[in-house]
C-alpha cells in the first residue's frame, strides 16, 4: 500500500510557478527594492544648515532648503517616501505643543517644499507632540496655555 509519508520528495512541486522569469518574480517570497524603503529625515530651522547626528554616523539634520536638494537623489533612486522628524528649537516649544498644528511650523513648511518640488514623493509626518512640547506629558492644564 502506498503511504504519502514514505515519499522522500515534497508533496507539492509547483514547477509551473518557476517556468518563466515573470512567474518566478511574481511568486518569490522576499524581494527588497527601493519601493520598500522610506527615508527618515531630521529637519532643522534655518537656511543652508547641516548638522551630523552624533549617535547615528552618516545621518544629518538638514534645513528645508538642503532637504529639497537632497530629495532629488531619493526620487532618482526610486525611493517612494520620506518620513519627516522636525527638530524644533526649544524657544518654539510650549506645554500645548501648538507648533504641531501651526501652518508655518517646521514640519508643515518642509512638507510643502517637498511636495512643490517632487509631487510624486510621499511625505510621512509624525503625529507625536514630543518634538513640540516642553514636557512629554499633555494634561488639561496645558490646553489652557
Regions flagged by a language model, labelled:
Residues 2-65:
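An N-cap/entry alpha-helix motif that binds or orients negatively charged groups
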Residues 94-97, 133-137:
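Short acidic, glycine/serine/threonine-rich loops at helix termini
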Residues 22-32, 68-78, 108-119:
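Short amphipathic alpha-helices and their capping/turn segments at secondary-structure boundaries
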Residues 96-125:
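Alpha-helix-loop-beta-strand connector modules within alpha/beta enzyme cores
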Residues 44, 87-89, 128-134:
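Active-site beta-loop-alpha junctions enriched in small/polar residues
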Residues 37-40, 82-84, 123-125:
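Hydrophobic faces of well-ordered beta-strands that scaffold small-molecule active sites
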Residues 51-59, 81-104:
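Glycine-rich, proline-tolerant flexible connector loops at the mouths of alpha/beta enzymes
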Residues 138-143:
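Conserved small/polar residues in nucleotide/adenosyl-binding loops
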Amino acid at each position: 500500500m502506498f503511504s504519502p509519508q514514505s515519499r522522500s520528495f515534497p508533496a507539492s512541486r509547483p514547477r509551473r510557478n518557476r517556468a518563466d522569469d515573470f512567474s518566478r518574480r511574481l511568486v518569490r517570497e522576499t524581494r527588497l527594492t527601493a519601493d520598500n524603503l522610506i527615508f527618515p529625515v531630521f529637519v532643522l530651522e534655518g537656511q543652508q544648515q547641516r548638522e551630523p547626528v552624533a549617535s547615528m554616523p552618516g545621518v544629518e539634520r538638514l534645513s528645508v532648503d538642503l532637504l529639497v536638494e537632497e530629495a532629488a537623489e531619493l526620487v532618482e533612486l526610486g525611493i517612494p517616501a520620506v518620513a519627516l522628524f522636525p527638530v524644533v528649537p526649544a524657544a518654539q516649544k510650549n506645554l500645548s505643543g501648538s507648533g504641531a498644528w501651526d501652518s508655518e511650523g517646521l514640519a508643515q513648511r518642509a512638507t510643502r517644499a517637498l511636495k512643490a518640488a517632487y509631487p510624486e514623493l510621499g511625505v510621512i509626518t509624525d503625529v507625536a507632540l514630543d518634538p513640540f512640547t516642553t514636557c512629554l506629558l499633555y494634561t488639561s492644564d496645558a490646553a489652557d496655555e
